[in-house]
From Swiss-Prot:
Protein name (Swiss-Prot/TrEMBL): HTH-type transcriptional repressor AcnR
Database matches in PANTHER family: HTH-TYPE TRANSCRIPTIONAL REGULATOR RUTR, HTH-TYPE TRANSCRIPTIONAL REPRESSOR RV1474C
InterPro entries assigned to the protein according to its UniProt record, in alphabetical order: Homeodomain-like_sf, HTH-type_TetR-like_transc_reg, HTH_TetR, Tet_transcr_reg_TetR-rel_C_sf
Role summary: AcnR negatively controls the expression of the aconitase gene acn.
Record domain HTH tetR-type: where: 10-70
Molecular function GO labels: DNA binding; DNA-binding transcription factor activity; magnesium ion binding; transcription cis-regulatory region binding
Organism ancestry: Bacteria, Bacillati, Actinomycetota, Actinomycetes, Mycobacteriales
GO BP of this protein: regulation of DNA-templated transcription
Length: 190
Protein backbone atom coordinates (compact mmCIF):
# COMPACT_ATOMS: atom_id res chain seq x y z
CA UNK A 1 0.00 0.00 0.00
CA UNK A 2 1.48 3.38 -0.97
CA UNK A 3 2.39 5.86 1.74
CA UNK A 4 0.34 9.04 1.48
CA UNK A 5 1.80 12.29 2.79
CA UNK A 6 0.00 14.50 5.27
CA UNK A 7 -0.21 17.16 2.56
CA UNK A 8 -1.95 14.72 0.22
CA UNK A 9 -4.35 13.61 2.98
CA UNK A 10 -5.13 17.23 3.77
CA UNK A 11 -5.81 17.98 0.09
CA UNK A 12 -8.12 14.96 -0.18
CA UNK A 13 -9.96 16.02 2.96
CA UNK A 14 -10.43 19.52 1.53
CA UNK A 15 -11.71 18.09 -1.79
CA UNK A 16 -14.24 16.03 0.16
CA UNK A 17 -15.37 19.10 2.11
CA UNK A 18 -15.78 21.18 -1.06
CA UNK A 19 -17.80 18.46 -2.80
CA UNK A 20 -19.88 17.79 0.30
CA UNK A 21 -20.66 21.50 0.61
CA UNK A 22 -22.07 21.49 -2.94
CA UNK A 23 -24.06 18.33 -2.24
CA UNK A 24 -25.54 19.64 1.04
CA UNK A 25 -26.33 23.00 -0.61
CA UNK A 26 -28.14 21.31 -3.49
CA UNK A 27 -29.91 18.48 -1.67
CA UNK A 28 -30.06 19.53 1.99
CA UNK A 29 -28.81 17.37 4.84
CA UNK A 30 -31.41 14.64 4.50
CA UNK A 31 -31.24 14.59 0.69
CA UNK A 32 -27.45 14.35 0.64
CA UNK A 33 -27.39 10.56 0.62
CA UNK A 34 -24.11 8.68 0.71
CA UNK A 35 -24.58 7.87 -2.98
CA UNK A 36 -25.05 11.56 -3.81
CA UNK A 37 -22.06 12.49 -1.69
CA UNK A 38 -19.95 9.93 -3.58
CA UNK A 39 -21.11 11.31 -6.93
CA UNK A 40 -20.59 14.96 -6.02
CA UNK A 41 -17.29 14.46 -4.22
CA UNK A 42 -15.97 12.03 -6.82
CA UNK A 43 -14.67 9.64 -4.17
CA UNK A 44 -15.88 6.37 -2.70
CA UNK A 45 -17.74 6.16 0.59
CA UNK A 46 -14.65 4.49 2.04
CA UNK A 47 -12.50 7.48 1.09
CA UNK A 48 -15.08 9.94 2.41
CA UNK A 49 -15.63 8.15 5.70
CA UNK A 50 -11.92 7.55 6.18
CA UNK A 51 -11.72 11.29 6.90
CA UNK A 52 -15.15 11.72 8.51
CA UNK A 53 -16.71 8.93 10.55
CA UNK A 54 -20.25 9.66 9.36
CA UNK A 55 -22.41 12.16 7.50
CA UNK A 56 -23.10 14.22 10.62
CA UNK A 57 -19.38 14.61 11.32
CA UNK A 58 -18.82 15.62 7.70
CA UNK A 59 -21.59 18.21 8.00
CA UNK A 60 -20.21 19.47 11.33
CA UNK A 61 -16.75 19.82 9.78
CA UNK A 62 -18.29 22.09 7.14
CA UNK A 63 -20.15 24.04 9.80
CA UNK A 64 -16.96 24.42 11.85
CA UNK A 65 -15.05 25.63 8.79
CA UNK A 66 -17.79 28.15 7.98
CA UNK A 67 -17.97 29.44 11.55
CA UNK A 68 -14.19 29.89 11.69
CA UNK A 69 -14.13 31.70 8.34
CA UNK A 70 -16.96 33.99 9.40
CA UNK A 71 -15.33 34.65 12.78
CA UNK A 72 -12.16 35.78 11.01
CA UNK A 73 -14.06 38.29 8.88
CA UNK A 74 -16.18 39.46 11.83
CA UNK A 75 -13.08 40.07 13.96
CA UNK A 76 -11.60 42.22 11.20
CA UNK A 77 -14.64 44.03 9.77
CA UNK A 78 -17.70 43.39 11.94
CA UNK A 79 -20.88 41.41 11.37
CA UNK A 80 -22.63 44.08 9.30
CA UNK A 81 -19.69 44.07 6.86
CA UNK A 82 -19.99 40.29 6.60
CA UNK A 83 -23.62 40.78 5.60
CA UNK A 84 -22.69 43.52 3.11
CA UNK A 85 -20.19 41.16 1.49
CA UNK A 86 -22.79 38.38 1.38
CA UNK A 87 -25.14 40.75 -0.42
CA UNK A 88 -22.53 42.08 -2.86
CA UNK A 89 -20.85 38.74 -3.58
CA UNK A 90 -23.24 35.83 -2.96
CA UNK A 91 -20.99 33.55 -5.02
CA UNK A 92 -18.36 33.77 -2.26
CA UNK A 93 -20.83 32.50 0.31
CA UNK A 94 -21.70 29.00 -0.82
CA UNK A 95 -22.27 28.11 2.83
CA UNK A 96 -25.58 30.02 3.01
CA UNK A 97 -27.67 26.95 2.24
CA UNK A 98 -25.61 24.96 4.75
CA UNK A 99 -26.49 27.53 7.41
CA UNK A 100 -30.20 26.99 6.72
CA UNK A 101 -29.70 23.25 7.14
CA UNK A 102 -27.96 23.90 10.44
CA UNK A 103 -30.95 25.93 11.63
CA UNK A 104 -33.29 23.09 10.75
CA UNK A 105 -31.12 20.50 12.50
CA UNK A 106 -30.81 22.66 15.61
CA UNK A 107 -34.59 22.47 15.96
CA UNK A 108 -34.92 18.74 15.31
CA UNK A 109 -31.74 17.02 16.52
CA UNK A 110 -30.69 17.50 20.18
CA UNK A 111 -27.41 15.62 19.68
CA UNK A 112 -26.48 17.85 16.75
CA UNK A 113 -27.52 20.95 18.73
CA UNK A 114 -25.14 20.07 21.57
CA UNK A 115 -22.24 19.51 19.17
CA UNK A 116 -23.03 22.64 17.16
CA UNK A 117 -22.94 24.93 20.20
CA UNK A 118 -19.18 24.34 20.43
CA UNK A 119 -18.68 25.45 16.82
CA UNK A 120 -21.00 28.44 17.09
CA UNK A 121 -19.07 29.68 20.11
CA UNK A 122 -16.15 30.58 17.79
CA UNK A 123 -18.36 33.02 15.88
CA UNK A 124 -20.14 34.27 19.00
CA UNK A 125 -16.82 35.03 20.68
CA UNK A 126 -15.59 36.96 17.62
CA UNK A 127 -18.76 39.06 17.48
CA UNK A 128 -18.70 39.76 21.24
CA UNK A 129 -15.02 40.65 21.16
CA UNK A 130 -15.57 43.09 18.29
CA UNK A 131 -18.57 44.68 20.04
CA UNK A 132 -16.63 45.03 23.30
CA UNK A 133 -13.63 46.53 21.51
CA UNK A 134 -15.84 49.06 19.72
CA UNK A 135 -17.70 49.85 22.96
CA UNK A 136 -14.37 50.50 24.68
CA UNK A 137 -13.48 52.90 21.84
CA UNK A 138 -16.82 54.70 22.26
CA UNK A 139 -18.17 53.57 18.90
CA UNK A 140 -21.16 51.63 20.23
CA UNK A 141 -24.28 52.95 21.87
CA UNK A 142 -23.98 52.66 25.62
CA UNK A 143 -27.66 52.60 26.60
CA UNK A 144 -28.04 48.93 25.59
CA UNK A 145 -25.95 46.09 27.07
CA UNK A 146 -23.44 44.46 24.72
CA UNK A 147 -25.10 41.04 25.05
CA UNK A 148 -28.40 42.56 23.84
CA UNK A 149 -26.64 44.13 20.84
CA UNK A 150 -25.05 40.75 20.15
CA UNK A 151 -28.43 38.99 20.19
CA UNK A 152 -29.88 41.73 17.98
CA UNK A 153 -27.11 41.35 15.38
CA UNK A 154 -27.38 37.55 15.47
CA UNK A 155 -31.13 37.79 14.88
CA UNK A 156 -30.60 40.16 11.95
CA UNK A 157 -27.96 37.79 10.53
CA UNK A 158 -30.29 34.80 10.75
CA UNK A 159 -33.06 36.63 8.93
CA UNK A 160 -30.61 38.02 6.39
CA UNK A 161 -29.21 34.56 5.61
CA UNK A 162 -32.69 33.12 5.36
CA UNK A 163 -33.74 35.80 2.86
CA UNK A 164 -30.62 35.38 0.71
CA UNK A 165 -30.61 31.59 0.75
CA UNK A 166 -34.30 31.33 -0.09
CA UNK A 167 -34.01 33.74 -3.02
CA UNK A 168 -36.02 36.49 -1.34
CA UNK A 169 -36.09 40.08 -2.59
CA UNK A 170 -32.83 41.91 -1.80
CA UNK A 171 -33.65 45.34 -3.23
CA UNK A 172 -33.66 47.22 0.09
CA UNK A 173 -31.17 45.12 2.03
CA UNK A 174 -28.27 47.55 1.62
CA UNK A 175 -30.38 50.27 3.24
CA UNK A 176 -31.52 47.83 5.92
CA UNK A 177 -27.85 47.15 6.74
CA UNK A 178 -27.23 50.91 6.96
CA UNK A 179 -30.11 51.11 9.42
CA UNK A 180 -28.77 48.19 11.47
CA UNK A 181 -25.32 49.74 11.60
CA UNK A 182 -26.72 53.13 12.65
CA UNK A 183 -28.83 51.46 15.34
CA UNK A 184 -25.83 49.94 17.14
CA UNK A 185 -23.37 52.80 16.73
CA UNK A 186 -22.83 55.61 19.20
CA UNK A 187 -24.40 58.90 18.22
CA UNK A 188 -21.27 60.70 19.42
CA UNK A 189 -18.28 60.96 17.08
CA UNK A 190 -15.42 58.79 18.32
Amino acid sequence: MPVVSNTELSMRRQEILEGARRCFAEHGYEGATVRRLEETVGKSRGAIFHHFSDKENLFLALAREDAARMAEVVAENGLVEVMRDMLAHPERHDWLATRLEITKMLRTDPSFRNRWIEHQRVLDDAVLERLQRNAHLGRMRDDVPIDVLHTYLETVLDGFISRLASGGDTDNLERVLDLVEESVRSSQPS
